[in-house]
Regions:
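Glycine-rich phosphate/adenosyl-contacting loop at the front of the ribokinase-like
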Residues: 1-64, 71-73
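Conserved N-terminal subdomain of the carbohydrate kinase-like
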Residues: 28-36, 54-136
Length: 137
């Protein structure tokens, strides 16, 4: 498949969690947003590819996902955005990367990230064919 742009980088199933008070060891902070379990599909390379595809270009992300790729809705999200999935490798025994973004009422942030399938131990040589068919990447 010919593509205009290849993007590379981690994918992330983002969860935005707003808390009433700053996080502190030994104390409980109440979550204030009921959307805290909603997944926001992201990662810079995914966001760029998705936006370019929505603008009519063919942009393909090169990344790894876990065995939960379909059940977490990420595959459907990409399909709905017409994002090519030929550059996606699935690591069945692993989870897709997850990020928990904690924001307190002072707008201070804590980011907690689980690399999952994007962990370096799963890295492998990319196929030359991915680059041979891309105009930019």
């Amino acid at each position: 498949m010919k593509v205009d742009v290849l993007t590379s980088g981690y994918v992330s199933m983002d969860h935005i969690i707003k808390i009433a008070t700053p996080a502190k060891v030994g104390f409980t902070s109440l979550v204030t947003n009921k959307s805290n379990s909603k997944i926001f599909y992201g990662g810079c390379s995914v966001n760029i590819a998705y936006a370019l595809c929505r603008l009519g270009m063919k942009a393909m992300p090169v990344l790894r996902v876990g065995g939960d790729y379909e059940s977490n809705g990420f595959k459907k999200f990409l399909e709905e955005g017409n994002v090519p999935q030929d550059g996606i490798t699935q690591i069945a025994e692993e989870a897709t990367s997850v990020c928990y973004l904690l924001q307190d009422n002072n707008n201070d942030h804590i980011t907690i990230f689980y690399p999952g399938a994007m962990d370096g131990r799963y890295a492998q040589k990319m196929k030359d064919s991915l680059f041979e068919t891309a105009k930019l990447g």
